[in-house]
Amino acid sequence: MTGRARARARGRARGQETVQHVGAAASQQPGYIPPRPQQSPTEGDLVGRGRQRGMVVGATSKSQELQISAGFQELSLAERGGRRRDFHDLGVNTRQNLDHVKESKTGSSGIIVKLSTNHFRLTSRPQWALYQYHIDYNPLMEARRLRSALLFQHEDLIGRCHAFDGTILFLPKRLQHKVTEVFSQTRNGEHVRITITLTNELPPTSPTCLQFYNIIFRRLLKIMNLQQIGRNYYNPSDPIDIPNHRLVIWPGFTTSILQYENNIMLCTDVSHKVLRSETVLDFMFNLYQQTEEHKFQEQVSKELIGLIVLTKYNNKTYRVDDIDWDQNPKSTFKKADGSEVSFLEYYRKQYNQEITDLKQPVLVSQPKRRRGPGGTLPGPAMLIPELCYLTGLTDKMRNDFNVMKDLAVHTRLTPEQRQREVGRLIDYIHKDDNVQRELRDWGLSFDSNLLSFSGRILQSEKIHQGGKTFDYNPQFADWSKETRGAPLISVKPLDNWLLIYTRRNYEAANSLIQNLFKVTPAMGIQMKKAIMIEVDDRTEAYLRALQQKVTSDTQIVVCLLSSNRKDKYDAIKKYLCTDCPTPSQCVVARTLGKQQTVMAIATKIALQMNCKMGGELWRVDMPLKLAMIVGIDCYHDTTAGRRSIAGFVASINEGMTRWFSRCVFQDRGQELVDGLKVCLQAALRAWSGCNEYMPSRVIVYRDGVGDGQLKTLVNYEVPQFLDCLKSVGRGYNPRLTVIVVKKRVNARFFAQSGGRLQNPLPGTVIDVEVTRPEWYDFFIVSQAVRSGSVSPTHYNVIYDSSGLKPDHIQRLTYKLCHVYYNWPGVIRVPAPCQYAHKLAFLVGQSIHREPNLSLSNRLYYL
């Protein structure tokens, strides 16, 4: 589970409230399924979705959430827009500035194929409108629960169907007067004047309505007793236990409602939350048994900081930012009313949770959201390890074949299984009386069937390698068998290279050299025997050997490692990428132990070594001449203040087989890159050095763009590219295209064949129905998968002065998915994006510094 996927919903602080609960505030709203029994917080204690002023722990019970217009606690729809960053992209209309695709952005080449997708139309009754009201209180009432309770005393006026976030009220009807005044009374007898002012009548397609639909849908999921974790909803009452790995899976769904080409539609996909059946305290205890006592606290911090935990008392997720060893469950904190309470007593009263270990430290989670517009950050959340479950998988689990195999049985769904699970959710919506009543009250309904439409399958590519041309089976998108034994396009001789190994791996080292001698002749690589260097199995010994033996004549260093210990790998890569710039190849010895795969592994190692020294493997036909292709991706370096590293990779020849690579560091909190101008200028110089002329087109594939950052990209990064191109020289005015690449999409596509659903073939393009009318965008399914459902990639052309037709952009994009030299097949994104990802990952994970620029013309990071 990646960091960007973890959206934690922690609410705003609320103090003690004296409310006479009347109307909807007094009881459960009609139509809701009663929540499971849960200890309700006592009045005056911490309530709400997350934290109290200053100190914090806790969240409101489900019944309380439903009292306050369920769903609107998570997202305010004030004029400034909602909190979910992806909605900020709604107002970015880039297509209107692209004259050549204003009329049509669809291509026509390829074979027509029938597809269906996990989208369902949302329909509304004729002349439907949403009425938005602003609510004022005199005197001012700060607490949202109190404001809601006072307003809902007048349910006879506003009606049973309403949505209120504390300031903005939405109704499916228009009140008689534009301004309506009513009076309410608090529990202590204070009279409050409430002014209800109509501010907007919203059509179904307005951005505010789109946000509203999503909130209403989340309300429906709560009615069905699904539990929100981050942005998604899960069913804790239907867990899947994997006891032999101490894991639990909660099945659930991702959902979003957006305006697509012709309809407003719900996109929903299956999601799975992987939890561990051990608490953080269990984890700490097990670690204590394996660690020296004086290193225990350091080791715990190293293992836990950055992880996401789930609180067992209210199913909220938090990121562990620190561990406070000076506090324990007996420590006290100050509540909103000024009184002090210990964690022990607080959890006993608030959640009926008994803490047994009174010496455990306290976990600290820093908030990310401020209180209101321009508000201050609330205090940190203080969590008890005993009451928190670990989530996600450790690196050890991810590298355990059996763990991943057992997980895949439940999480890797075929198209038909995925359609069945999504269909179950839609069936529940149509069959649940409470859900249907809610939808009827708002005048909304959903289609019952998956959306069907036509896509296109692009022509498969021919692979050129060493003067020969190969076809491959498009169903598998892999040409490793077809090209085996064929010479490469460009090879680098292995004349002067080192092989560093430990004594216990002497046999593996000799075996590797013998097998390399067997596989390299067919590739056209001339190879001499390596300089063999035996070292102790310590990081310092490897570094000492590198310092003593690597010279300016050394072409590449191969390090045979006993294990995949990160510290040793990092030290080797850091030295050879920065202090002594030399291509390097690290090999874990056990991968050479299986006789049935040893030749295939030796082949892969030889190919990687050739690439890292500057060789070229294969190519496809690239009709677009004088075009430089750029790929950009970002990685967050958690060890360096969580700053970002952007990998920048650009082609420097017309065949797009040679690449220039740089990286840029960016301060914390910024994903967009300031230093791209320097990278692009350097790439243009590298192109000029190889070709003696400048490219007439620059096409940028921009990956690593987070939700809500599209506007910044359009307004800031694109002008930076344009300024850079202008600064190259008078009269130089190449055409620029910028395409945003997005892998994390919830859309899934299924090919219809003989009454069954299956994965679309590689090369399937979708540019109708489920694309966005305000964007020049399309999907491509480029890769093949052996199991489960294939994931498409979304491409959004945000700037384009090329004048190229949609067919040409789509075909170029698909071609570029064929030239990633670490895999003899089609990958999910264009090769420069994957190269940029590999570079940024290496720098962020291992090097933490800018690599030496003398390596920039080689794929040293593969």
Curated annotation (Swiss-Prot):
Major enzyme class: hydrolase
Annotated Basic residues bias: 1-13
Protein name, UniProt field: Piwi-like protein 1
Main location group: cytoplasm
The keyword Magnesium appears for this protein: yes
Ranges where the record places region Required for binding 2'-O-methylated 3'-end of piRNAs: 317-319
Subcellular location: Cytoplasm
Knockout-associated phenotype: Mice display spermatogenic arrest at the beginning of the round spermatid stage, resembling the phenotype of CREM, a master regulator of spermiogenesis; mRNAs of FHL5/activator of CREM and CREM target genes are down-regulated in testes. Female are fertile but male are completely sterile, no sperm is found in the epididimus. Chromatoid bodies from round spermatids are not fully compacted and remain as a diffuse chromatoid material.
Organism: Mus musculus
Tissue expr: Expressed in brain. Expressed in testis, specifically in spermatocytes (at protein level). Only detected in germ lineage cells of adult testis. Expressed in male gonads 2 weeks after birth at the initiation of spermatogenesis, but not expressed in female gonads.
Domain notes per entry: The D-box (destruction box) acts as a recognition signal for association with the APC/C complex, ubiquitination and degradation. The PAZ domain specifically recognizes binds the 2'-O-methylated 3'-end of piRNAs. The MID region is required for recognition of uridine in the first position of piRNAs (g1U preference, also named 1U-bias).
Disulfide cysteine pairs (residue numbers): none
Induction: Expression is activated by MYBL1/A-MYB.
Symmetric dimethylarginine PTM positions: R14, R53
